[in-house]
């Protein structure tokens, strides 16, 4: 089953209907047909928005219907310059209790595109857009003359909080 694919059929707005509610209704119909779940009780935000939560220290989840993604970053042995990046898709159980078929683990080869993983649907190319940034980010982090990282006040506040929490664990302020 595909995670998500763009549908070519046009969405028609009813008189007085907003584009947002029309897209949410469209998603409810598409996902009902592909997952056998009645999504009528879900809000428009749950059907459209890309809500993201990061769980300390390396786990990001999008608890939404349209993008049921989970990212997990893990150490790659003892190499601080590399890591393992996992992407999971978590689909809901059908209304009759039938569970989605479990996916087989697939490991990309070096330089293999995420877009080549058909199960990711339209999300493979989205991940591919972000991956080329990682080596430049890593290189920039290592190149600082002041040997520290300057973080933005708002956009990178979660990174700052993550490292402050790590420092507290290392200092023994939090139980392990």
What are these regions (language model features)?
Residues 1-176:
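C-terminal catalytic domain of Rieske-type non-heme iron oxygenases
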């Amino acid at each position: 089953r595909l995670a998500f694919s763009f549908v070519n059929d046009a969405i028609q707005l009813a008189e007085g209907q907003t584009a947002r509610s029309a897209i949410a209704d469209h998603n409810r119909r598409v996902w009902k047909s592909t997952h056998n779940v009645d999504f009528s009780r879900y809000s428009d935000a749950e059907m459209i928005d890309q809500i993201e939560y990061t769980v300390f220290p390396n786990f990001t989840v999008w608890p939404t219907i349209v993008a049921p993604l989970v990212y997990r970053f893990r150490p790659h042995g003892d190499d601080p310059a590399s890591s393992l990046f996992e992407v999971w898709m978590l689909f809901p159980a059908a209304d009759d209790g039938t569970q989605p078929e479990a996916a087989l683990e697939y490991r990309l080869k070096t330089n293999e595109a995420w877009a080549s993983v058909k199960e990711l649907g339209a999300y493979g190319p989205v991940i591919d857009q972000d991956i080329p940034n990682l080596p430049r980010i890593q290189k920039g982090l290592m190149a600082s003359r002041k040997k520290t990282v300057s973080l933005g006040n708002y956009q990178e506040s979660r990174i700052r909080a993550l490292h402050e929490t790590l420092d507290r664990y290392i200092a023994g302020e939090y139980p392990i």
